[in-house]
Amino acid sequence: MHDQAQMAYWQKDSKIGAIQSYNSNLPSVMDFTLHDAIGGGVFNESKANWDKGIIKVYENFTNDFLYPNTNNILVFAENHDTNRFNQIYQGDFKKYQMAMSLVATVRGIPQLYYGSEIGMKGDKNVGDGDIRRDFPGGWKGDSNNAFSNEGRTKEQQQFFDFTAKLFNWRKEKSVIHTGKTTHYIPENNVYTYFRYNDSESVMVIINNSDEKQEVAVSRFKENTQHYSTGKDVISGQTINIKNNISIEAKSALILELK
């Protein structure tokens, strides 16, 4: 299924299913169309137009009204039946950061496939065995033990540290679990959205272009007017959001607004 209406049909209490007097009673469905964008190479599309670049991600969420419960949708960058993310993007850490920042902050339930957190690769064209390789370590004779800090390579540790920090932050944030979403149509291949509830607000900026961008915060006044700063959840840096925000090429910024 690669259409939101098809997927929404299978979620419990679907209005689309009700047309045929059908209710699957399945509480959760998988966001295959978001995966289609991620797995289709969206983060390689540095030059954007009406059907290229980060607009593909934006358009996925414009159809959320079709789902009975958007908080109970499974979001993922890869799984046991797909190409590994790091196969598609050749281990590009910046693109991994962008994808995981997206998966961790949009509505729904994030799914991590084992090995994502250390940058594992696997080619579906080679066969299912290649995308389901053994996780390195745990057996005598394994040359690489990625179960421990000491056993990971420098590259594996880089992926692991980022993933751990991001998702440990997420697990404490009800604003991400059940908060509302406001998103804005991308400009210059930069996608900005907000997750918020009555007590918190998080601003997410994803720059999919290959150039540093200046993001005009005034465009998002509806969501920023009561805040003056944002804390970067990864670096801990505090950013003034009353002015334009600079964001590096091929990067994501997650800000807790204050």
What residue spans do the PLM features occupy?
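Active-site-proximal helices and loops of the catalytic beta/alpha 8
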Residues: 1-66, 91-93, 102, 119-165, ...
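Active-site clefts of carbohydrate-active enzymes
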Residues: 70-91
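Structural recognition of the beta-strand scaffold that forms the well-ordered cores
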Residues: 74-77, 102-105, 110-114, 120, ...
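Conserved, mostly hydrophobic/aromatic
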Residues: 80, 103, 115-117, 166, ...
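Surface beta-strand/loop "capping" patches
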Residues: 179-200
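Asparagine-centered strand-capping/turn motif at beta-strand->loop junctions
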Residues: 205-209
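Solvent-exposed beta-hairpin/edge-strand motifs
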Residues: 220-236
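C-terminal beta-strand-rich structural cap/linker in extracellular carbohydrate-active enzymes
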Residues: 241-258
